[in-house]
Amino acid sequence: MTTDAELRELTVGTGAGGEQLGTDMVLNIGPQHPSTHGVLRLRLVLDGERVVSAEPIVGYMHRGAEKLFEVRDYRQIIVLANRHDWLSAFANELGVVLAVERLMGMEVPERATWLRMALAELNRVLNHLMFLGSYPLEIGAITPMFYAFRERETLQAVLEEVSGGRIHYMFNRVGGLKEEVPAGWTGRARTAIGEVRRRMPDLDRLIRRNEIFLARTVGVGVLSAAQAAAFGASGPVARASGLDLDLRRDEPYLAYDQLEVPVVTRTAGDCHSRFEVLLDQVYVSLDLAEQCLDQVDRLTGPVNTRLPKVLKAPEGHTYAWTENPLGINGYYLVSRGEKTPWRLKLRTASYANVQALATLLPGCLVPDLIAILGSMFFVVGDIDK
């Protein structure tokens, strides 16, 4: 015989008792999705169209780069160093050679230092243009992609001429650069920078104040400065939340201490702020690259250091970090005096930045998910290594 109490327990099961009955939906995004460079999986718990919890699941592109470093000599590791973040290839190989040079106490020719800075800033612009074109595409704006890739091709031709590679440059060497740049290259690079600077307002006007773009991004995916700091976020993601941090200014390497590096920041911490920081950083990097080219033209001398046939680093350890296009990358190198690293640990910007998704996504709507995910500007290979 059913009592009144049992009847009451049954009727509670609709509506208010939904949580106890497990009516929330678990949704897997990925492990393949068009808004990522690579393969990422998100495990979401949804209440209707609102995200209750989010868990980024990484590792699908893990290729064991850090273990492979241990069986490659100090010349060969450069080949691997630029592959985990293929949009920041020059910056990645630069960080590795800086760590090796620091451990060996090596002085790099001044001309090579300024050439490295010029190429690093051009690589930064190429990275940013990729996201400036692909991010609007993810939320329905097709045209900006064509503008962004027009500018990318202009600068890509310059880097391809100097290194021979379009994506994986492999132009850095321990002690400097692979070889001297072609005759007249600095002039052609300066011309390309001028063309991109002149045409960038076309992309700027097309998207920055577009009403539909503003509706999809303003106030969406807000990451506070405290949250960004807690997750170790850096680069455009952190600066859009108000963290005024840039290693080129705060912990200068190469010859950045001889330049005035403007740091672009915002305080809103939303998707639109992250996009604006990326856009404005393009102008800054174009200016810095041009200043570096001016210095290169004033300097003479070699661009590399003569090295022994077998290159061995002394026993010890060191840490080098760089301001990569997507944020701070760190390189912890341990040597036992052999021709291969005993350990080379990578601290990548994308890995730190993507952790914030677990805090950023809960509370948002499913239609806003792609807008938030795309605005975090990460490369999955940089996460998984």
From Swiss-Prot:
Major subcellular location class: membrane
Enzyme Commission identifier(s): 7.1.1.-
Recorded topology in the membrane: Peripheral membrane protein
Location relative to the cell: Cell membrane
InterPro entries linked to this entry: NADH_Q_OxRdtase_suD, NADH_UbQ_OxRdtase_49kDa_CS, NDH1_su_D/H, NiFe-Hase_large
Name of the protein in question: NADH-quinone oxidoreductase subunit D 2
Subunit and interaction comment: NDH-1 is composed of 14 different subunits. Subunits NuoB, C, D, E, F, and G constitute the peripheral sector of the complex.
Top EC group: translocase
Catalytic reaction(s) noted: a quinone + NADH + 5 H(+)(in) = a quinol + NAD(+) + 4 H(+)(out)
Keywords of the record: Cell membrane, Membrane, NAD, Quinone, Translocase, Transport
One Pfam family per UniProt: Complex1_49kDa
This protein's encoding gene: nuoD2
UniProt keyword Oxidoreductase present: no
MF term (GO), any: NAD binding
Organism per entry: Salinispora arenicola (strain CNS-205)
One cellular-component annotation, GO: plasma membrane
Known function: NDH-1 shuttles electrons from NADH, via FMN and iron-sulfur (Fe-S) centers, to quinones in the respiratory chain. The immediate electron acceptor for the enzyme in this species is believed to be a menaquinone. Couples the redox reaction to proton translocation (for every two electrons transferred, four hydrogen ions are translocated across the cytoplasmic membrane), and thus conserves the redox energy in a proton gradient.
UniProt family annotation: Belongs to the complex I 49 kDa subunit family.
